[in-house]
């Protein structure tokens, strides 16, 4: 049996020792306007999701689990939420199930960022990964790790629903090339503007690995 952890789920994406982003994952929900039913609001939200190249693959499907979740909160698909009233459709923060992504990198404390880097650095030979954390606040003094993924889904940081985007592929490719060029002392090197910063970050990371 697993212990229940109070808080919200965050994915920390680390590539070659660089913390690219911290993304909060939130369950699917709709926001009322005082006119449309939950079912109609889901259809409206799905049209919005189609405008995103990533989210359009994952519409909010009205499943039996969503109906059961609404029923457990004394609601149904026919309920008309008040203006600005937010209604959760599930307790699961899964993008495939209609969840959303918020880039909270700039809001999270440096201690949490260092914690994520230290956790990944504690695994020998692992320089890139996706850490699933549970936080109670943006400056939680005791964050919890619930999962470590050796193959991070970098698209999560590229296409957040809210907040600034990032370019994880650029970070990964350029940091690998910078490392390769310094290790092999190549004459005709590919110019990377942030090469020194990539190498410095990786060396700091490796000291803890």
Give the predicted meaning of each segment.
Residues 100-110, 122, 126, 135-209:
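C-terminal active-site "lid" helix and adjoining low-complexity regulatory extension at the edge
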Residues 10, 21-22, 31, 140, ...:
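Intrinsically disordered, low-complexity acidic/polar segments
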Residues 11-25, 34, 69, 73-78, ...:
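Beta-strand scaffold of nucleotide-dependent catalytic cores
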Residues 1-7, 20-22, 27-52, 56:
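Conserved ATP-binding module of the ATP-grasp superfamily
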Residues 45-139, 195-203:
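A long amphipathic alpha-helix within ATP-dependent nucleotide-binding catalytic cores
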Residues 3, 14-16, 135-137:
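Short, low-complexity Ser/Thr-rich regulatory SLiMs
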Residues 35-41, 48-62, 163-172, 180-188:
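Low-complexity, flexible helical/coil segments
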Residues 7-9, 128:
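Short beta-strand-initiation
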């Amino acid at each position: 049996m697993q212990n229940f952890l109070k808080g919200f789920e965050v994915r920390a994406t680390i590539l070659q020792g660089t913390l690219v982003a911290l993304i909060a994952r939130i369950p699917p929900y709709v926001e009322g306007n005082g006119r449309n039913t939950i079912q109609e609001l889901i259809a409206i939200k799905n049209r919005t999701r189609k405008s995103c190249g990533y989210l359009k693959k994952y519409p909010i499907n009205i499943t039996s689990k969503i109906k059961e979740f609404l029923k457990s909160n004394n609601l149904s698909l026919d309920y008309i939420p008040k203006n600005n009233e937010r209604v959760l459709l599930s307790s699961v923060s899964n993008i495939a199930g209609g969840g959303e992504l918020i880039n909270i990198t700039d809001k999270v404390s440096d201690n949490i960022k260092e914690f994520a880097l230290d956790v990944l650095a504690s695994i020998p030979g692992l320089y890139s990964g996706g850490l699933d954390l549970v936080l109670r606040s943006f400056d939680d003094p005791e964050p919890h790790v619930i999962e470590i993924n050796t193959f991070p889904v970098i698209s999560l940081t590229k296409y957040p629903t809210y907040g600034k985007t990032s370019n994880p592929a650029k970070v990964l490719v350029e940091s690998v090339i910078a490392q390769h060029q310094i290790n092999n002392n190549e004459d005709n090197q590919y110019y990377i503007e942030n090469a020194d910063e990539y190498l410095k970050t990786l060396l700091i990371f490796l000291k803890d690995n």
